[in-house]
């Protein structure tokens, strides 16, 4: 279950963007700009909590398996792992739609493997 504490902790893990207040703005794993108060909203800066290792594959709500992701990137990622499609990125002034194929980085994949290797 996602609690307010979890939302806060996941937000704190998201990337800091130079020139933007980190209490209000962060960058998701796909490079999209997200705003703290837009959690759960369909908005140009809205975001959701992504399960890096999808729940349908045995992933759960451990903080190491969670990350902030722009809602459109999360929806395009679906249950794909480790490779997935992202559709929004930040161009330095605003979010723009740009389809890209991405892969969860090696460090994160090793951590996920340690968490879920026996499942």
Mark where each language-model region is:
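Histidine-centered nuclease catalytic patch
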Residues: 32-69, 77-82, 89
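Short cysteine-rich loop/turn motifs with clustered Cys
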Residues: 1-47, 70
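Polybasic, low-complexity binding patches
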Residues: 59-64, 76-119
């Amino acid at each position: 279950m996602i609690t307010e504490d979890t939302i806060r902790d996941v937000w704190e893990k998201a990337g800091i963007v130079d020139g933007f207040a980190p209490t209000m703005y962060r960058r998701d794993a796909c490079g999209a700009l997200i705003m703290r108060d837009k959690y759960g909203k369909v908005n140009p800066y809205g975001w959701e909590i992504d399960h890096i290792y999808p729940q349908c594959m045995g992933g759960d709500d451990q903080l190491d398996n969670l990350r902030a992701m722009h809602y459109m990137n999360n929806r395009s990622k679906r249950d794909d792992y480790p490779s997935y499609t992202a559709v929004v990125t930040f161009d330095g002034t605003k979010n723009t739609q740009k389809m890209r194929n991405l892969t969860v980085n090696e460090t994160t994949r090793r951590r996920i493997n340690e968490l879920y290797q026996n499942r």
